[in-house]
Amino acid sequence: LDAIPKVATGAFPVGFADINSLIKFLDQNPGAPVTAVMMVYDKPPFAVVGRKSLGISGPGDLEGSVLGAPPPDGAWAQFPSFAKANNIDIGKIKVEPVGFPTREPMLAEGKVDSVTGFSFSSYLNLVRLGVPENDISTILMADHGLKLYGNAVIVNTEYAEANGDTVKAFLGAVAAGWKDAIADPTAAAAALVKRNPAADAALEERRLELAINANVLTDYVKANGMGGIDSARFSAAIKQLSETYDYKAAPDAALYFTDAYLPAGGFPVK
């Protein structure tokens, strides 16, 4: 969330942020000079992560169960839309407010049956806590009716208008980085550790692989290249967002994303 106002004020020319948060920000700050220019998480990592041994394998198992959800969690914010898309009666779920640090430990201890969170983060946290991987069920909301997109590269529009070639070159570099990371996740994790020596290379490689497979290298991206969006899906996503957010003004897709700095056909990443 911090990236959006910093880019909007010009403190930074580019950033990386959830496009749904950007839509809300522009609704609340009309005319702010910020927009998305490259989609990265074609499927957002919003998920319900549960344990099969506790009876959670799919959306239909959530009624009658205990769900741990941090109130400010991004995945929890989208849960009503996910529930609506799957005909889930939220009133039949016992929702347990939990803190971020206690979310996965409570699931590991069996105090809740599932939690909301980012798919790859919650999954790896559970593995580190000793939960067998074959006991973990990851219910990615994007695979179960959630139309929303995820994180995108955002720009200050005033900067972009004055420095279009720089923005295009930057997006090309981002795409090249992803292409290399997809081809060799081990080398990508090693580069991350070089930047942040405190990071665990094996853990970050696994996190990267999970994100690539579920969120970045989707069927749409394989067919259409990286960076762009499907206009029909984006319109549906904007409409679906209204189930959990009250727009102050009529939403306008053109304000939230532009492909003006992308190559025709997007960036091939595979």
Predicted regions and their residues:
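Short, surface-exposed acidic
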Residues: 90-94, 133-137, 198-210, 247-255
